[in-house]
């Protein structure tokens, strides 16, 4: 257990989170990480040995900023978050697959899912740290790589909104069937996080196999 993070995750109102995910495809949660934990994660950005790859976003026309992929082994806090958050998100992912007429295929625990990824040659860890300066941004995109991927992503804010930076809202664009797209601009407080769907989801009020998609920035 990393400074009680397991207990904090277990204490979340998961029934409310599942309801939000089903209704709108994302769920915003108040601070889960403490200020000192956020500071510790920010400080890691300058520790070269922790990362396997650095991406200059402007070089690839992804936006303006940069991010770094962690290499194995992951920092204990990040590993603990992955292991504790995955099971409930897997429940939601399987529920949505069934509503779309597909077989529930996500294991109940993280390790069997990672083993499934490894069997498909997907062995590199994907958690990352992003860094933006004034004027930085991330273009709309969907993060789905390889034959096996998990349909949810979780993002944490590590700085203080309106103190360390201004703006910086997280943009989700919902692509709805037979309707115009709808945007959601979400401000995340320090230590808070956002769960969001990055692939097809069933649409409330429509036939079970009707889908909507989300694009992120």
Locate the predicted segments by residue.
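Alpha-helix-centered segments that form part of catalytic cores
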Residues: 111-131
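Histidine-centered catalytic micro-motifs
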Residues: 138-145
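Non-heme Fe(II)/2-oxoglutarate
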Residues: 16-113
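Residues in well-ordered beta-strands of folded domains
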Residues: 90, 128-130, 141, 155-157, ...
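Short, conserved beta-strand element in jelly-roll/cupin
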Residues: 129-134, 147-164
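A generic fold-level signal
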Residues: 21, 121-124, 147-150, 165
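Fe(II)/2-oxoglutarate
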Residues: 1-23
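Catalytic core of Fe(II)/2-oxoglutarate
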Residues: 150, 161, 165-217
């Amino acid at each position: 257990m990393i400074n009680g993070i397991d207990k904090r995750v277990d204490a979340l109102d998961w029934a409310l989170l599942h309801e939000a995910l089903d209704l709108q495809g994302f769920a915003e949660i108040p601070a889960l990480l403490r200020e000192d934990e956020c500071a510790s994660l920010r400080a890691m950005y300058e520790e070269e040995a922790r990362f396997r790859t650095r991406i200059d976003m402007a070089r690839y026309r992804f936006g303006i900023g940069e991010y770094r992929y962690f290499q194995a082994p992951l920092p204990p806090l990040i590993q603990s978050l992955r292991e504790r958050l995955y099971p409930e998100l897997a429940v939601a992912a399987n529920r949505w697959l069934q509503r779309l007429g597909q077989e529930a295929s996500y294991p109940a625990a993280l390790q069997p899912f990672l083993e499934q990824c490894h069997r498909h040659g997907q062995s590199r860890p994907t958690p990352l740290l992003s860094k933006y300066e004034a004027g930085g941004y991330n273009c709309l995109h969907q993060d789905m790589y390889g034959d096996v991927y998990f349909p949810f992503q979780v993002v944490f804010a590590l700085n203080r909104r309106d103190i360390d930076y201004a703006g910086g809202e997280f943009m989700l664009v919902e692509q709805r069937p037979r309707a115009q797209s709808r945007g959601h601009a979400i401000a995340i407080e320090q230590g808070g996080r956002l769960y969001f769907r990055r692939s097809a989801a069933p649409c409330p009020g429509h036939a079970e196999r009707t889908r909507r998609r989300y694009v992120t920035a």
